[in-house]
């Protein structure tokens, strides 16, 4: 399975349209965008409604999930844009999949609220031995919170995705990639 676009909004597509990409290119099951992250293009709630509506329509036509997979950063907005979509549109929570949900305690809290509202969240496995241990502890905490539906929580490796390293000033000082081996270690 694949996603069209990347972090930016408006989305960059192959056919010129999120809907066409999902309907006409068989591996496509949805679209990717970054939210609440210093690397995102800061899509508004209305931008996400338009994106989610397009992905959902295409999913209905193609028999795919029609997901909006959201790279979540540690920004101030947290899941506010996602809750905006749920509060101001008819897009079902199941079409919205925020990732990297163990990034901050506040994001984890918001993830619990999203799951309580019928949504799904994805947690990222560690990217080295210490991070594996840290992520496993966070995941255990998240899964044992009151009202948490474990069937609505997934874990992925971010395998071979770029992994920037930042210094204390927030400057990118290196780039590497995540290995898939840490998914098994985290679980």
Q: Where are the regions that the model predicts?
A:
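Metal-associated gating/positioning segment near the N- to mid-region
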Residues: 1-4
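Acidic, glycine-rich active-site loops and adjacent beta-strand->loop/helix elements
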Residues: 6-10
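Histidine/acidic residue-rich metal-binding segments in metalloenzymes
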Residues: 13-123, 131-152, 184
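Residue-level signal for short, function-critical loop segments
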Residues: 127
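His/Asp/Glu-enriched, well-ordered alpha-helical/loop segment
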Residues: 145-187
